[in-house]
């Protein structure tokens, strides 16, 4: 089981334009017993779907500008058997969208760093709240 933390984007520039801080905040909140998370900022490089395996956890942060790409990533991860967790301002304001359109197992509303370790533990236990 691996943990992927993804900032979705339709376009990759190959250089960091504005890398979101939340990627590293959640990485820092990931308990060490689960290993280092795989951080993917798609403004730098698109995610390789082959890296997502059954049982992995995929955290996707969306805002309105990248929501469609994020929802597509969630569906792809779900089809590969991964746990799909959404967060970010768009998911907070419109939590039904990731559930209805993005194959979400769960949506974190508000600051994710407070609940991220619990979300991971719930996925590992096979029982999300």
Q: Positions of the model-derived regions?
A:
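Glycine-rich beta-alpha loop elements in corrinoid/cobalamin-binding modules
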Residues: 26-129
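Glycine- and acidic-residue-enriched helix-capping/strand-helix junction motifs
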Residues: 12-23
